[in-house]
């Protein structure tokens, strides 16, 4: 498999001074983004107030409730079905190939990414946690007579997990005062933008981490929104600890994300941590 770099794109490759053209395009996009932020700063409040008075599809509730999150997840999954069928059984990348090779091959293991042989069953170049998960589903496929079935089962579960995480994040925006038309638009985008289900059907560490990180980020925002009060709930605290652990286990940058964000929370909301530790 070959991944083409930016300079190999035909459009830019045929242009003189293509790097200059590329940087000018980036500068133009940056300027447009800054202009958009400036205009939103001037007129954003009025726009939000206007949208807040509108209630498109009154029968559809996009609020932070179990019923709304489940309903949104089901709708998203139904609209993802064509892409799930197209991607059957699943897509994988080279990292996953290496991880599956580790899972099914006893030591010593040749690791193509580093071009060497290791006298070890598993190599932590990619998270071992992910390797065990991916390998277990392919192994399960072997048990029932088809590796494709094992991969497809994993892809379906990851799609459901991703759809639930995205739906929850859209519904959570209600707590932040985001108008319903915007929440509805974001949910529709999640449901119909093809790269999202395509990504969710990929058996790779990045796809798994993405869904975990969405939930971790929502939990982080909830702590900030409540000024630390959310940490007083044992259920919320347990969810936050589990999500933090999954962030660390599913992708190595998750360690740094947790350390930096956790340090901020530990310092800013230390009184809630102390109270929680005493209660435990």
Residue ranges, per PLM feature:
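Multi-pass, polyprenyl lipid-linked donor-dependent membrane glycosyltransferases
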Residues: 94-97, 154, 160, 188-220, ...
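Transmembrane and membrane-interface helices of multi-pass
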Residues: 63, 77-80, 159, 172-176, ...
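Specific aromatic-rich, kink-prone transmembrane helix
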Residues: 104, 168, 208-228, 240, ...
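Membrane-interface alpha helices of multi-pass inner-membrane proteins
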Residues: 236-251, 262-263, 279
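Perimembrane helix-loop-helix junctions
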Residues: 257-279
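Start-transfer (signal-anchor) and selected internal transmembrane alpha helices
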Residues: 1, 15-82
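Transmembrane-helix motifs of polytopic, lipid-linked glycan transferases
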Residues: 156-177, 215
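Membrane-proximal lumenal/periplasmic loop motifs of glycosylation machinery
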Residues: 84-93, 104-162, 202
């Amino acid at each position: 498999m070959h991944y083409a770099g930016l300079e190999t794109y035909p459009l830019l490759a045929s242009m003189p001074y293509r790097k200059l053209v590329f940087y000018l395009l980036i500068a133009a996009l940056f300027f447009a983004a800054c202009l958009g932020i400036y205009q939103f700063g001037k007129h954003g409040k009025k726009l939000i107030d206007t949208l807040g008075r509108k209630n498109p599809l009154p029968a559809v509730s996009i609020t932070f409730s179990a019923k709304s999150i489940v309903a949104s997840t089901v709708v998203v999954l139904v609209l993802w079905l064509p892409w799930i069928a197209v991607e059957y059984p699943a897509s994988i990348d080279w990292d996953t190939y290496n991880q599956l090779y580790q899972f099914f091959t006893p030591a010593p293991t040749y690791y193509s990414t580093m071009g060497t042989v290791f006298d070890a069953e598993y190599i932590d170049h990619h998270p071992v946690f992910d390797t065990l998960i991916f390998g277990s589903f392919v192994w399960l496929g072997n048990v029932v007579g088809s590796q494709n079935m094992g991969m497809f089962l994993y892809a379906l579960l990851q799609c459901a997990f991703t759809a639930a995480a995205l739906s929850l994040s859209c519904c959570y925006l209600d707590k932040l005062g985001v108008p319903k038309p915007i929440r509805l638009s974001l949910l529709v985008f999640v449901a119909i933008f093809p790269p999202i289900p395509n990504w969710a059907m990929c058996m790779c560490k990045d796809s798994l981490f993405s869904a975990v990180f969405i939930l971790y980020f929502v939990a982080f925002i909830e702590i900030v929104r409540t000024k630390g009060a959310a940490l007083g709930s044992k259920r919320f605290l347990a969810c936050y600890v589990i999500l933090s652990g999954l962030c660390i286990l599913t992708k190595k940058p998750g360690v740094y994300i947790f350390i930096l964000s956790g340090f901020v929370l530990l310092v800013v909301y230390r009184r809630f941590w102390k109270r929680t530790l005493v209660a435990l």
